[in-house]
């Protein structure tokens, strides 16, 4: 068992190192009183301990020991008149791990406690190999992302999906979508955006990666305008780029570099990316409005999306989530809800783009509902720059 005291730093900061050392000794004493003759406790480092069970104990035994220790510590806290209130988190690994070598054992020990602490205070986690493999894969992907960015964004690619005017059925623009692949033992693997984009955000690598995608998309917009003069490009922006970077400056630089009209570069964000009008977000929105850059709410209809969001964010248009669209096409109840949202949104001068259009019948229904723009596999799947130019430079033919 790998044991860690939760928020021990706060005890040291508020009461001093002397009292902190007293807590360390007391916690060790409390735990020792809970152990059998076949169990040993060792102080590992700082606020961490290791309990070794020399018997073939089960997971249930580990849970029981954890509860016993927790009760003992709770009594200690009461006896100390609540001078320090704390808990412990415990990660449990099988003793067989010791046979795998010191380094592997250390890694799994650290992983188990980290997982326990990620559950909140008083966490308890029993090592699971599948969880560990996910953890290792996450580390490999992060390392590969860093290396790719350093090496001129090798592995990153921009895919484009057409956006079509609902009434004329003519292509008016595209959404730029970040894609990433990495070399593995089996060959090149395309990593799902659902997997690598959160890692980019978590590490802050979304700032340089997002800047690269933005410039590639702006260059593509400039290229497409040779064939479709009013072509517009939609780019996605993360809350991390707003909080930690200077994405509004990046957007303005891209517009200037490729001599684009501001209204031709649309900025998309999902509602979950909004930050309750923090100073950084307000500055970002004001910069877009001041320079005439359209702002788009993506994936509307998911989570707790509401019309207050549209009112407060004042977007140029909203994109109805593809799952919401599919439900509306297959359920009368959802269809009525979908249909009635459209005039409400239009009433405040906000346009609507329906995502996830996959069939001609869906196109016709959207036209009846007076949706403004359409996007989905019916018009084309996301594809690379070369293929997109070949397919759409001369427009799009919808029957």
Please give the residue ranges for each predicted region.
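Conserved long alpha-helical elements within nucleotide-processing catalytic cores of c-di-GMP signaling
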Residues: 5-32, 42-46, 50, 59-67, ...
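A short glycine-enriched loop-to-beta-strand structural element that forms part of the catalytic core
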Residues: 43-52, 80-115, 122-128, 230-238
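C-di-GMP signaling machinery
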Residues: 96, 112-157, 167, 199-206, ...
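Conserved helix-loop-beta segment at the catalytic/binding core of cyclic-nucleotide signaling proteins
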Residues: 28-59, 293-297, 350, 360
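EAL-family c-di-GMP phosphodiesterase catalytic domain
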Residues: 53, 183-186, 238-245, 264-279, ...
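Catalytic core of bacterial c-di-GMP phosphodiesterases, primarily the EAL and HD-GYP domains
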Residues: 168-173, 203-280, 356
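Active-site core of bacterial EAL-family cyclic-dinucleotide phosphodiesterase domains
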Residues: 137-199, 236, 297, 354, ...
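Catalytic-core segments of nucleotide cyclases and related cyclic-nucleotide turnover enzymes
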Residues: 63-67, 80, 95-121, 139-142, ...
């Amino acid at each position: 068992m790998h044991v860690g005291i939760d928020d021990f730093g706060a005890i040291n900061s508020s009461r001093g190192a002397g009292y902190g050392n007293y807590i360390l000794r007391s916690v060790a004493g409390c735990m020792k009183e809970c152990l059998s003759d076949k169990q040993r406790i060792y102080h590992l480092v700082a606020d961490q301990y290791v309990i070794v069970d020399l018997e073939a104990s089960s997971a249930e035994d580990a849970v029981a020991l954890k509860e016993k220790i927790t009760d003992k510590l709770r009594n200690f806290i009461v006896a100390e008149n609540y001078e320090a209130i704390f808990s412990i988190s415990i990660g449990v690994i099988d003793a067989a791990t010791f046979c795998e070598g010191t380094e592997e054992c250390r890694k799994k020990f650290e992983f188990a406690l980290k997982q326990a602490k990620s559950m909140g205070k008083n966490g308890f986690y029993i090592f699971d190999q599948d969880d560990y493999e996910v953890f290792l894969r996450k580390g490999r992907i992060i390392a590969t992302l860093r290396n790719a960015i350093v090496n001129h964004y090798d592995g990153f690619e921009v895919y484009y999906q057409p956006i079509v005017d609902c009434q004329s059925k003519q292509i008016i623009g595209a959404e730029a979508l970040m894609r990433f692949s990495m070399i593995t033992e089996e060959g090149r693997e395309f990593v799902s955006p659902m997997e690598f984009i959160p890692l980019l955000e978590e590490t802050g690598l979304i700032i340089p990666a997002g800047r690269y995608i933005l410039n590639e998309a702006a260059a593509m917009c400039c290229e497409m305008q040779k064939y479709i003069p009013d072509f517009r490009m939609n780019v996605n922006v993360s809350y991390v780029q707003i909080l930690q970077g200077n994405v509004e400056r990046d957007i303005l630089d891209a517009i200037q570099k490729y001599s684009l009209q501001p209204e031709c570069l649309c900025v998309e964000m999902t509602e979950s990316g909004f930050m309750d009008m923090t100073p950084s977000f307000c500055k970002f929105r004001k910069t877009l409005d001041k320079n005439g850059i359209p702002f788009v709410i993506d994936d509307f209809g998911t989570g707790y999306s509401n019309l207050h969001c549209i009112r407060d964010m004042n977007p140029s248009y909203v994109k109805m989530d593809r799952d919401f669209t599919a439900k509306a096409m297959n359920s009368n109840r959802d269809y009525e809800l979908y249909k009635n949202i459209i005039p409400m949104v239009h009433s405040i001068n906000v346009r609507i783009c329906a995502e996830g259009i996959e069939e001609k019948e869906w196109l016709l229904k959207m036209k009846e509902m007076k949706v403004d723009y359409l996007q989905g596999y019916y018009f084309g799947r996301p594809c690379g720059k070369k293929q997109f130019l070949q397919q759409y430079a001369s427009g799009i033919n919808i029957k």
